[in-house]
């Protein structure tokens, strides 16, 4: 999975619905998606070797009362939707905490060209 790191720093830290707004978490999920794309492209030999996104799982570090995990996950899905033609399946899961205090983590399964 990828957390929202840019230039070695998290773009936000804390629980969504408490320290992190849903809008900031949406943007953090976009960063996670781009980081996942970069990691997969490196393994596959370039972004042009990635045919499509199959599945996206978005973990959202949520305050006890936050129930908008799907809106945060839209940050990743919307990003992939702009880059790939075919839709993907997705899960959005609320969790108590993530590594380094990240507000979200995105796990992606890509299909590489054969």
Where are the regions that the model predicts?
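Short, polar/acidic, helix-capping and beta-turn segments at strand->helix junctions
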Residues: 2-114
